[in-house]
Amino acid sequence: MREYKIAAIPADGIGPEVIAAGLQVLEALEKRSGDFSIHTETFDWGSDYYKKNGVMMPADGLEQLKKFDAIFFGAVGAPDVPDHITLWGLRLPICQGFDQYANVRPTKVLPGITPPLRNCGPGDLDWVIVRENSEGEYSGHGGRAHKGLPEEVGTEVAIFTRVGVTRIMRYAFKLAQARPRKLLTVVTKSNAQRHGMVMWDEIAAEVSKEFPDVTWDKMLVDAMTVRMTLKPQSLDTIVATNLHADILSDLAGALAGSLGVAPTANIDPERRFPSMFEPIHGSAFDITGKGIANPVATFWTAAQMLEHLGEKDAATRLMSAVERVTEAGILTPDVGGTADTQQVTDAVCEAIAGSNILNMAAVG
């Protein structure tokens, strides 16, 4: 029996709702597979913890998390806590402290979900966005001077290192190489940002020589938004900076139908530390407690987590079950359905328990 220790951090807003749904689905997979078990410990860190303790997580938070095989994260952010405190107090310290430098965000149109793009269905939009997750625009460097005075100045410094760019570029090329189309698009803004972004272009050209079977091209980030919208079939694997990929992946989720179906994995490819898996969507306080949060993104990131742990059959079974459920029209309101979170979760669990899930071809 293979055993895994998972740290669950539901955090804020709808985070606890979707993480509860994800844990229910993981339990269903355990029962269906019968050859692995997941032991979960839940941490109450987040905005409520901050209001009580003045910090988003304890000082030894990272040390507590080191013993786990993976981290299952909900969402962070609250209306009465500044966003920079919630982000820099919890999620970013985990990503940077554990050197989770590869943020991997798959996007595709799931069967049964109608995307906003005309003539775009399952198979037409099937991307993976690789986001540099350790430096760049979110390096945290900069400052403010003369605060409150007319001459106040604020600086936000983007840092790009050769080692950081090279390793994310190599990761993206390897991922593209493993996908059927072997196609990579490198996104920068090197016409206007003539230092760090030009270095990105140069390193991409250098690394590409290691992958002669991968076809690659370059796009400026503004032009990339147009291409994603008008020619989604022309894209496959995409790599971009911390900020650019953050923005593009939200656009990708919307183009696929909803951020409620968009997952993300914060990966330490060298496996020195636990990697973290989360839905892209935020804490969504406007629907918190209503029971209508879309759990599909959390199920998808749970599949990413299972694959990272080596449980590829379980990951495939989970995504097959999800696609059967969406195809059947069991959908939450954000994607045009009337089902609630629990109904979608129960349907996925029932699909997992059904026979021959692995042998059923996923639609799309």
Curated annotation (Swiss-Prot):
Induction: By tartrate. Its main location: cytoplasm. Pathway: Carbohydrate acid metabolism; tartrate degradation; 2-hydroxy-3-oxosuccinate from L-tartrate: step 1/1; Carbohydrate acid metabolism; tartrate degradation; 2-hydroxy-3-oxosuccinate from meso-tartrate: step 1/1; Carbohydrate acid metabolism; tartrate degradation; D-glycerate from L-tartrate: step 1/1. The keyword Ligase does not apply. Its cofactor is Mg(2+); Mn(2+); K(+). Has multiple catalytic activities. Apart from catalyzing the oxidation of (+)-tartrate to oxaloglycolate, also converts meso-tartrate to D-glycerate and catalyzes the oxidative decarboxylation of D-malate to pyruvate. It is found in: Cytoplasm. The gene is ttuC. GO terms for molecular function: D-malate dehydrogenase (decarboxylating) (NAD+) activity; magnesium ion binding; NAD binding; tartrate decarboxylase activity; tartrate dehydrogenase activity. Belongs to the isocitrate and isopropylmalate dehydrogenases family. Pfam families: Iso_dh (PF00180). Binds 1 Mg(2+) or Mn(2+) ion per subunit. Its EC number is 1.1.1.93, 4.1.1.73, 1.1.1.83. It catalyses: tartrate + NAD(+) = 2-hydroxy-3-oxosuccinate + NADH + H(+); (2R,3S)-tartrate + NAD(+) = 2-hydroxy-3-oxosuccinate + NADH + H(+); (2R,3R)-tartrate + NAD(+) = 2-hydroxy-3-oxosuccinate + NADH + H(+); (2R,3R)-tartrate + H(+) = (R)-glycerate + CO2. This is Probable tartrate dehydrogenase/decarboxylase TtuC. The keyword Iron does not apply. Keywords: Cytoplasm, Lyase, Manganese, Metal-binding, NAD, Oxidoreductase, Plasmid. PROSITE patterns: IDH_IMDH. GO terms for cellular component: cytoplasm. Mn(2+) binds at D222, D246, D250.
